[in-house]
């Protein structure tokens, strides 16, 4: 096998497929990147048996063939090569990588041992503008649980309806729901997908193109540009999140988003990350007092102007959770709804963005 490829295109391809390698597997070939040189380019594949990634990239192929090269070592080498053409040439169980005045001879792995790329039979699919997909993932992913003992909470519930696409995540202390409207949705589907994997997909190079989301019996398939990313769906039943979203409120407050963010950040300087921030809403005065305190450190408070519908109320919420939710809102205004100090508080984005963020209250003395 022999081919030449532009260094920047090679680096981009390796960076993408590196997300699919198994770094701690007892199967050596899973730590490598499978490369097939054919026709006008290369097919690169990686897998850890849970996820699989395929990427096609143009190259000048002089001799077709296949090989598997240790991915981490190859990526480190390519990162440090000059901006020039990179030549690969295999010989028995080695590959020589040459660029400019540099040359590396590496041991390869047997391509025959590399698992075949999944032959997926997609039962239903939907196309979504990639920029909107990434925006949804960014809003909900930070709520995904890191507790592996409850697998469904480490995932994001993706569902479609006649109205469009929805993503939902919860760690049982908070809940994030993001919606976008789509036209022409032919089939409705629902799947729980790894939150980590979704963030990796959303981290791909941004282009003004659509990403296709497809489902098989036990996998989710993302097709974007010249790449295919497959991951096993998380099995289990996602919590019935709809039943914990209050249908009514006693107080609804409209804040300027950035003003509320900066106020919470400032009072949070005297509190630990898990400490509560108190929001004291005064309906008559048309403001909210944001305050926080930590024993042996001190206290802080800030008055924020707002529009209040309903009654005055005070509620305490986890400081970091509040910031996470507010930082996910991109509209100029944000609405806050609650019905009592011991009921959830709900942040909703303003006009033009369909995003809900629910936080469970903190009991304070």
Regions found by a protein language model. Name each.
Residues 1-365:
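Structural preference for solvent-exposed beta-strand-turn elements
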